[in-house]
């Protein structure tokens, strides 16, 4: 029985184990492009000299936040609070509930630490907005 040629052996073993590698010069094309991520209704606008465009944007309810750098979440939140006083009132009212729950829990667990923490939080309205940092700063 004659032995098969080396090229035939390679072809048979390649079919059994894997597909042949793409030839040099051919590009691999992705199957489908990704869908763009959806963003909230917050729109960043650039400065425009055309007052008609600005007036049109104001009529549509688009709020402009201008920044020279990459804004962080705190910067965007402050800008939104300045443009939406109703949202500011809603956000300020929301943290009061977790703070009240925390103060009740602290009364049950630790008496001395609660006396220091409750005196500071009741006298300062700014600390209400910085609730996540309050536990990490306590001794």
Swiss-Prot record:
Residues 98-107 have a biased composition (Basic and acidic residues). Residues 120-130 have a biased composition (Low complexity). It holds the Pfam family FLYWCH_N. Residues 1-36, 86-139 are annotated as: Disordered. This is FLYWCH family member 2. It comes from Mus musculus. The lineage of its organism: Eukaryota, Metazoa, Chordata, Craniata, Vertebrata. The gene is Flywch2.
């Amino acid at each position: 029985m004659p032995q098969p040629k080396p090229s035939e052996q390679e072809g048979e073993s390649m079919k059994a184990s894997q597909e042949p590698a793409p030839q040099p010069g051919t590009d691999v094309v992705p199957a489908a492009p990704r869908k763009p991520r959806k963003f909230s209704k917050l729109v960043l606008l650039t400065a425009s000299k055309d007052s008609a465009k600005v007036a049109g944007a104001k009529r549509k309810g688009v709020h402009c936040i201008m920044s020279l750098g990459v804004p962080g979440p705190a910067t965007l939140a402050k800008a939104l609070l300045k443009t939406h006083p109703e949202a500011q009132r809603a956000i300020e009212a929301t943290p009061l509930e977790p703070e009240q729950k925390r103060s009740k829990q602290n009364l049950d667990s630790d008496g001395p630490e609660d006396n220091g923490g409750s005196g500071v939080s009741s006298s300062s309205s700014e600390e209400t907005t910085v609730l996540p940092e309050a536990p990490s700063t306590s001794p």
